[in-house]
Amino acid sequence: MLWAGGMRLGMARILLMLVHAAAACEFGPMPYSVTGIVFRMTKPAALLLNQETARLIQASFKHAKFPNITGERSMRFLGTVAYTLANIQVSDLSIEQSEVELKENDAIDIAIKNVTAFFRGTLTYGYAGAWFLQLFHSVDFEIQSSIDLQINIKLLCQEEQVAADASDCYLSFHKLMLHLQGDKEPGWLKQLFTDFISFTLKFVLKRELCKEINLLAQVMANFVHNVAENFVQDEAIGLDISLASDPLIKANYLESHHEGLVLYKNYSDVLSDSVFSPSLLSESRMLYFWISEHILNSLASAAFLDGRLVLAIRGEKLQALFEFEDTEAQQKAVHLIFQGNSYNDSVAKVWSLALPEISLQPEGTVVKSLVAVEISIFPPGEEPLTALYMEEEITVTIQAAYVEKKLILRPVDSQIEFKVFNCTADPSGNDQSVRNFLQKMISAVGIPEVISKIEPALTSLMNSKGLHLFEIKNPEIITRKRYLIVQLDFSFPNHLLLDFLEKTL
């Protein structure tokens, strides 16, 4: 029976290897050139997450389904003794120590030491004596065990996403002690079952526990992928986070490379000139995200095509823009544009006329856009009129930070060039003072006002994906020529793991 079980386990491993080979991803000769997003987790982060390993192992033990264990043996004077261990359940599980090591180009080695567990169930046994005397008994049992567990997790690419293979799993038993109910059974019976049940039990425990651990590792990998996929999706706009190359395991970090192409209706996105190189990321922080300039450009294009780059300003907000200073030029501009009408009866509409262009530089994120501004007045009881229409090419450099769970965008430089300028009260356009005031106003308060609308919108979007649940420490957003890096440390939110276990198990 054990030989047959070993053969089945061996065949299962062979089939698993064939499945992995069949599901392996194919990549081009230059995978870095098509890499839009890179995720790097360093060893300190792996050590932090390893502290949660105990909960995953406990879940594996408790969720494992143990089959009934049956066997028989011929005994002198007793005849054939048959037994069944049924309704096996785990209780009182404790883990003394868990260690993790990253084995370069191989696996994540997790060594779990001194796992103490009690397996409880019902033992039914019977034997036919030499004088045809048949006796059958049923008694509750408890098995006290002390186990070391070694799991070697390999990271693979399956169906263009990261998959975890934890099939390389070993159990070492330091103790396996059988207790029968109240220890009232004869000592020879206890010794008998301890001797020839233990080997079978070890085999079954290893098979079922390792199977459950491997399943949980795969479910966890899928869960992480789904969370990441949801994080980069907002309504019709999303990112394709398919792998651009096989995931890496290095001595000090784990790393995955993703395409990051924008998904939006019929929008066609192609990346072939990424500047990523592993040397661009260090190992001093827990987590790193490398993002190509191309990704931000494509996201801005999708937002434009989706009609999101539109803003209406009215009432007190509009008044604050036009009265940010009290000068003769300001008073003249307000009089010419609004003609004595109230700000409450006026609306300024701002929108992009063409696809924005984004470039990443050491100074920050440079956004260049052709923008239209239209001020409409709705006098009570009269026909609405367009008081001002202008088009300008605006280039603004923005520096970003993440502080107290909020995204902060700070404009540090801007350039404004008027392309079209039509003021109803000055059709000739000869009054340069109005144009000069508007240019100053747009630079001083107009651009900050637009950015102040973007900040909470993006913060709210990220929080809706659960970012605020993480305790992020000292995050930095660093821009370089054609790419940016987000680097941070973090504390793991325990409730997220519990939520995962509740939903999946």
Curated annotation (Swiss-Prot):
Intracellular or extracellular location(s): Secreted
Gene Ontology cellular component terms for the protein in this record: extracellular space; high-density lipoprotein particle
Keyword terms of this UniProt record: Cholesterol metabolism, Disulfide bond, Glycoprotein, Lipid metabolism, Lipid transport, Secreted, Signal, Steroid metabolism, Sterol metabolism, Transport
Listed CDD domains: BPI1
Catalytic function, reaction form: cholesteryl (9Z-octadecenoate)(in) = cholesteryl (9Z-octadecenoate)(out); 1,2,3-tri-(9Z-octadecenoyl)-glycerol(in) = 1,2,3-tri-(9Z-octadecenoyl)-glycerol(out); cholesteryl (9Z,12Z)-octadecadienoate(in) = cholesteryl (9Z,12Z)-octadecadienoate(out)
Glycosylated residues, chain numbering: 68, 114, 266, 344, 422
Signal sequence interval, chain numbering: 1-24
SUPFAM superfamilies, sorted: Bactericidal permeability-increasing protein, BPI
GO molecular function terms noted in the UniProt entry: cholesterol binding; cholesterol transfer activity; phosphatidylcholine binding; phospholipid transporter activity; triglyceride binding
Primary site of residence: secreted
Protein family (similarity comment): Belongs to the BPI/LBP/Plunc superfamily. BPI/LBP family.
Name the record gives this protein: Cholesteryl ester transfer protein
Organism in which the protein naturally occurs: Gallus gallus (Chicken)
